[in-house]
Amino acid sequence: MSAESHYLDAIESEENGEIEEALEHARLAVKADPEHSNAWWMITTLLAPDGKYPDIEQASKALVACTKVVNLDPTRVDAWVKGGRLMVDHLGLYEDALHWWQNCRDAAPLESVPIVEQTTILSDLGMYPEARDRLSSLFQENLDIANSQLARISHLHRTLERSAEQNPDSHFKPWKKNDGGWTAIKMR
């Protein structure tokens, strides 16, 4: 059976709600043709569907499949987004996600999404000056920003400006066992 036949069977199985069977057919498709990016993408979305929380094994396998997709087709921004979200939201791989988004920037230099995602990660890590500088590059490079995102990005930029000007010792650092923020949390 050809890779395309397995892929079509995977689509049919998914449409019938037979997720495990769809996953098996998609895996057979990539076994027959390791460069079948649509089958790799199907594996990704079956293992980690939007709106669901995959376990760590599913998230890891979905990330492997997603990596195959972006290696085969670096212009697939949807795959970059999915991989980045898997790394941060499900696997806690913040530093790897920063590199992931930099690779996305290299593959799609006119996209604003990687800069916004890197900014968010840096901000989550408490690296406010770096996050501010990264977000500023969005404006310096004159990248296209959707009108729907402009207000959110402007608000984020103002927030980062204020945070970057604060004393870094006043920021909560959850990775530090004796940070004062833990005392405030325990008091609640």
Where are the predicted features?
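Canonical tetratricopeptide repeat
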Residues: 8, 42, 82, 117, ...
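Short coil/turn linking the two alpha-helices of tandem helical-hairpin repeats
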Residues: 11, 44, 49-56, 84, ...
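Structural signature of tandem alpha-helical TPR/SEL1-like repeats
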Residues: 15-25, 51-68, 91-103, 126-134
